[in-house]
């Protein structure tokens, strides 16, 4: 497995690198990366229902769409992003969660994973993930919050008037879990 420790903090660059490595690469890859403040939404999400655009514009925080599913996430230099890309006949995304939990446990962090592939410390969600498959290649990527600006995270991912939009766009809204 090839290890890539990306020194680029542009979320758009790192997301494009993931997509290239998945679709054009042949090697199995483990990539670590961080992003300057940014919001990343899933492939099937609507910006209007996931991101407080006014807050993003006021803080000059770009919004990117990734090519995998999953919910909206906030990135800054206080979180680490992990990407696993492998050639496989059968993608078992739980395996990547297990690897991440084992790594954190070995580092002395008491964590637990759940059936939705989230990771928790003391009952608080510190990691969410998204997955996708392209031909015979699978990708699992996740965030790991450790010193993230949670005030900004919660303001950016809190959309006013969402209740009215839920009835119209229910299929495009993710199941949110508060990050404390």
Question: How would you describe each model-predicted region?
Answer:
Residues 74-86, 137-138:
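DPxDG-like acidic metal-binding loop motif
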Residues 59-80:
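A glycine-rich, hydrophobic loop/mini-helix early in the fold
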Residues 135-137, 142-172:
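Phosphate/diphosphate-binding glycine-rich loops and adjacent basic-rich segments that engage nucleotide
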Residues 1-48, 131, 156-158, 176:
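Active-site loop/lid in soluble adenylation, ligation, and acyl-transfer enzymes
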Residues 113-131:
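Beta-rich nucleic-acid/ligand-interaction surfaces
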Residues 90-106:
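Long, well-ordered alpha-helical scaffolding segments within enzyme catalytic domains
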Residues 45-65:
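Short, His- and charge-rich active-site/binding loops that engage polyanionic ligands
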Residues 171-180:
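Residue-level detector of conserved catalytic or cofactor/ligand-binding positions
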